[in-house]
Amino acid sequence: VLSYNRLLDLGLLIRKYLRHCESIGMFARISDIKPKTVEELKNLRHLGFDGISIGTESGNDNTLAVMNKGYTANDIIEQCKKLEEANIRYNLVYLTGLAGKGKGERNAINTANVFNQLHPFTVNFVSLTVFSESELYEEIQRGSFVEATEHERLLELRTFISRLHIKTTLLGNTVSNTVPF
């Protein structure tokens, strides 16, 4: 996590050495935004910070808790509204399959309900990929987490899109998706 002061220093260096740079983008977590005030975010926006990609992954409190994300659906709303107030564009990432077998529809509905309260520039879809060195892989081996099938993930994505009622661009062009679009 980069502090406000560190981001400010980086922004000033970029402005000094890359004078024609129009936008400074980055990846962030909801918890990275939380310690920054709206005034600090406005200062960063003035330096060119814009187009932040946020790996929210879900807007379902149960899924967020089980995956130890460290924030709630309400936190997503609060922090993204701070970005909006600071006039910083942001992109949200939704991770299909994260809730596990049989839980995708509820996850999709709750996430769409959260995203419908926001104004993301884009919503990116990525499908869960479990790596052998992850804690989730260990949970799968123990039987405490069962992965959603590809069919379930497609149904989850369809449910999410059908419930999403905001003006945004939807992107699903990653190799992790069953049907990239």
Report the location of each language-model feature.
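Short, acidic/polar
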Residues: 7, 35-43, 105-113
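Surface-exposed cleft-lining segments at the edges of enzyme active sites
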Residues: 62-69, 96-102, 144
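Short glycine/proline- and charge-enriched loop/turn segments
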Residues: 137-144
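Core AdoMet radical
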Residues: 1-4, 18-35, 49-76, 121-124
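Radical SAM enzyme core and accessory elements
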Residues: 178-181
